[in-house]
Structure formats: structure tokens, C-alpha cells
From Swiss-Prot:
The gene is asnS. This is Asparagine--tRNA ligase. GO terms for biological process: asparaginyl-tRNA aminoacylation. It catalyses: tRNA(Asn) + L-asparagine + ATP = L-asparaginyl-tRNA(Asn) + AMP + diphosphate + H(+). Homodimer. It comes from the Bacteria. One of its GO terms (cellular component) is cytoplasm. It comes from Acetivibrio thermocellus (strain ATCC 27405 / DSM 1237 / JCM 9322 / NBRC 103400 / NCIMB 10682 / NRRL B-4536 / VPI 7372). PROSITE patterns: AA_TRNA_LIGASE_II.
């Protein structure tokens, strides 16, 4: 049976008015009087609902339909009629309604506002609410926009491994992958676990980043990007941290930090524009019900040239600020969210790239600057959030990279293949990482990362 999507009715109304159509979806609300009733139907194709009018004289099963519970799945036949004086532009006058699957009266999503905290406990049902219908449709659009941006520019999409033997960040906050008996693992003479008896004959973890593997492909294809899940065993129970999240990580060869920042700015503006143009109903909803400054903020971003400031200059600005910070401002300390927001919201009033951070607070693979104290790193800070993108020019000089790895106590043998890139045709190259969920939070105004990923994995929580 061919059904018409509600999205098609809204986008091409004139093609359907006065015609008999069939729609299928789920009941959001139902109300009735003695001889007629109204159903708000959502079919998943569009943010807005379709109103269905049903009358006793037309439906043999009128009483059964009038008693439908919210959440029931139905198929409705009828004529689409314009309603210029009403809230909705049109409605379906039903001639037949079939119950595909009834919902029980204890359906958790009744017609009232539910807190986001409560909806997290029923994450399998929350996509049926207005807010999460909008969030996850925008998530889908943004994922497509990211691929579209890079594909239009000739980038090669690389699938990097989920299971890895290396730590891209050198931070050690990784989830171990093992088939060993955790109650009685084999041990070496010194008492440590003998991972040579494990599935991969070595210690392995879930990836924290696809960057290192991505770099290998940029040395062959020049411009590449990865887009996949990453995992951090970081015990941070905050609104901005999750143990499982998605990262967008491009790598560009024959490129320096300036090229990297230009790419990051172009990409962020592109995906915001794409969302504004292709999800107007959802974005209007977010602006009305989540953050009433959202559209102004996003339009300001796409129309502004991003500011640039070095880390040292940023520290100087912050140390002279008339605002008291919870975390001390000191050269050598990483910037905290309060510092980042002060720079973007009070000083520059737009997105800002902070560059040239102290080497001691950045990863081993970042290119050492001539001052031997800072590295060619950049963070993109945006108003309302703080850091949204982090990137750097990579260290292409073998001796510099080896020295840095020794300083940090990293095992050369674990990164032999990464060091090979510096032996065989090394070139300047750069890249960055965009936390996909943080981008969604920024573009929708949602304030908690748990509300922009379908089934969040956080400290003490792996339900569903």
C-alpha cells in the first residue's frame, strides 16, 4: 500500500488538496465529541503533525477510534482539505481509519510536558516527543551536511578502527578490550596481566580518536576525513561529557595551522547554514522553546569573520579582566570554560581561534614552535559553549617527534607505523577534531550532551 508522507503534504500542498490520500503514523493526541473527533498524527517524516477529522457517519469503527490511546499506530484514508482560518493549513477528512497497532493507556508519553531528566529514563520512547523529534532530525541533517561539505571538496572518507593498540591523546583514559577471564587472567612473572595470551596477542582498547590512522591516509590521498564513534573512560559526570561520542576529524597534507583554521571555519559555517536552510521548522522550535537567542547567535556566526588570538595574548586579556574567575588565570594552565566564554562573549563577541598553546598542556603529535615552549595548536571557541573544535599542525619532523614522545614516556614500539610517516615522504600536515555532539548542542541550544545522542553512555549509565 502506498502512503503519502506528511512532509510531502507540507512541502507540496497544492499537489494533494482535494485528493484522496492515505497516511500512516502515530497518534499524538485524540479528542472527540459525540459525533466527530480530531487526531493529531505524526508519521516521522516531518516535525509538524497532520490533523485528521473523523466523523461517526463516515466510520463504522468510530467508537473504537475515539477511544484510541496516545501512541497508537494507525492508517488513515481521506480527502485533504485546506483550512485557511485554522491553526493548521489543512486537515484530512477521514473516510476510513485502520488500527495498525493500539497503545495501552499506561503509555508514558501523555499529553503534558515531561522533564528531560525523565525522558532520559525512557530513551527508547523520547524520539516521539516534539523536542527529541527535532533534535534527532537535526542530528541526521548535520551528519549529512558534514559528509556533503567534505565530499564537495574532494576529501576521501576513511573508516578508522574502533579497536586500537595506540592512544592518540596519550592520556590513558581508555576502555580496555579483552577476552581474558577477568577473574583469573594469565600473568607474567612480575605479576602483571599477560596480554600476549589475549585475542589480539596484545593490549587493546576502544579508540579515543581516529586521528593517527587518519594521518596515514592523508599521506596518500592528501585530504581525508574520518567520522565515527570514539570512547573516553573519563570519570566526568557533567553536561558536556559522555563516554561514547562521535568525532569528525579531517587531515590535510601540504598544509599548516592557517589552512587548518580556514577549513574549520568554512566547515562550521557550512553545516550551520545547511541546518538553517533545511530544518526551518525545527530551528524555529528550538528558538521558541529552548533558547530564544539561538537564531540570532547562529546567524551572527555565519556572517562573521572569526577572531584570532594567541594563547599568550588570551592570558594577558583574562588577567586584566574585571571579572573574577573560579579557576586561576596563569600562563601554563589550560583555559577553562569560564575563560573561553569570557573571550567569546565579552571581549570578541563572536567565535575566536586561540592558537599557540604551551606544549605541556597539549598532545605529543603537535608541531613545536620556534620558541620551544609552545605548539602550533588551535582551539575554536564559540559564544555560549566555549571550545567546539580542537586542532593543530602535526609534527612532521622525526627527531622532534621522537624527542617529544620520550619526554612523555610513550613507547616508541607502539607507534612505529606512525613514526614511519616521518621517514617516508613526510610533509607539513594539519587537522582538527569536531565533537559532533557538542556541535549539535550548539546548533540546537540543547544544554546536555545526554539529550543529543540517542542512547547516551555516561558514568554509571549504559542502559538500552
Amino acid at each position: 500500500m502506498k502512503t503519502t508522507l506528511v512532509k510531502s503534504l507540507y512541502r507540496n500542498t497544492k499537489d494533494y488538496v482535494g485528493k484522496e490520500i492515505v497516511v500512516a503514523g502515530w497518534v499524538r493526541t485524540v479528542r472527540d465529541s459525540k459525533a466527530f473527533g480530531f487526531i493529531e498524527l505524526n508519521d516521522g517524516s516531518f516535525f509538524k503533525n497532520l490533523q485528521i477529522v473523523f466523523e461517526e457517519k463516515n466510520l463504522p469503527n468510530f467508537k473504537e477510534i475515539a477511544k484510541l490511546s496516545v501512541g497508537s499506530a494507525i492508517i488513515a484514508h481521506g480527502e485533504l482539505v485546506e483550512t485557511p482560518g485554522a491553526k493548521q493549513p489543512f486537515e484530512l477528512k477521514a473516510t476510513k481509519i485502520e488500527i495498525e497497532g493500539a497503545s495501552t493507556p499506561d503509555y508514558p508519553l501523555q499529553k503534558k510536558r515531561h522533564s528531560f531528566e525523565y525522558l532520559r529514563t525512557i530513551a527508547h520512547l523520547r524520539p516521539r516527543t516534539n523536542t527529541f523529534s527535532a533534535v534527532f532530525r537535526v542530528r541526521s541533517l548535520l551528519a549529512y551536511a558534514i559528509h556533503k561539505f567534505f565530499q564537495e571538496r574532494g576529501f576521501v572518507y576513511v573508516h578508522t578502527p574502533i579497536i586500537t593498540g595506540s592512544d592518540a591523546e596519550g592520556a590513558g583514559q581508555m576502555f580496555k578490550v579483552t577476552t581474558l577471564d577477568i577473574n583469573n587472567p594469565p600473568r607474567k612473572e612480575d605479576g602483571t596481566v599477560d596480554f600476549s595470551k589475549d585475542f589480539f596477542d596484545r593490549e587493546t582498547n576502544l579508540t579515543v580518536s581516529g586521528q593517527l590512522e587518519g594521518e596515514t591516509y592523508s599521506m596518500a590521498f592528501r585530504n581525508i576525513y574520518t567520522f565515527g564513534p570514539t570512547f573516553r573512560a573519563e570519570n566526568s559526570n557533567t553536561a558536556r561529557h559522555a563516554a561514547e561520542f562521535w568525532m569528525v576529524e579531517p587531515e590535510i597534507a601540504f598544509a599548516d595551522l592557517e589552512d587548518d583554521m580556514e577549513l574549520a571555519e568554512d566547515m562550521l559555517k557550512y553545516i550551520i547554514n545547511y541546518c538553517l536552510e533545511n530544518a526551518p521548522e525545527e530551528m524555529e522550535f528550538f528558538n521558541n522553546f529552548i533558547d530564544n537567542t539561538l537564531l540570532d547567535r547562529l546567524n551572527n556566526i555565519v556572517s562573521s569573520d572569526f577572531a584570532h588570538v594567541t594563547y599568550t595574548e588570551a592570558i594577558d586579556i583574562l588577567s586584566k579582566a574585571d571579572q573574577k574567575f573560579e579557576y586561576p588565570v596563569k600562563w601554563g594552565n589550560d583555559l577553562q570554560t569560564e575563560h573561553e566564554r569570557y573571550l567569546t562573549e565579552k571581549v570578541f563577541k563572536k567565535p575566536v581561534f586561540v592558537t599557540d598553546y604551551p606544549k605541556d598542556i597539549k598532545a605529543f603529535y603537535m608541531r613545536l614552535n620556534d620558541d620551544n615552549k609552545t605548539v602550533a595548536a588551535m582551539d575554536l571557541l564559540v559564544p555560549g559553549v566555549g571550545e567546539i573544535i580542537g586542532g593543530s599542525q602535526r609534527e612532521e619532523r622525526l627527531d622532534y617527534l621522537e624527542n617529544r614522545m620520550k619526554e612523555l614516556g610513550l613507547k616508541m614500539e607502539d607507534y612505529w607505523w606512525y613514526l614511519d610517516l616521518r621517514r617516508y615522504g613526510s610533509t607539513r600536515h594539519a587537522g582538527f577534531g569536531l565533537g559532533f555532539e557538542r556541535a549539535i548542542m550548539y546548533i540546537t541550544g540543547m544544554s546536555n550532551i545526554r539529550d543529543v545522542i540517542p542512547f547516551p553512555r555516561t558514568v554509571h549509565s549504559a542502559e538500552f
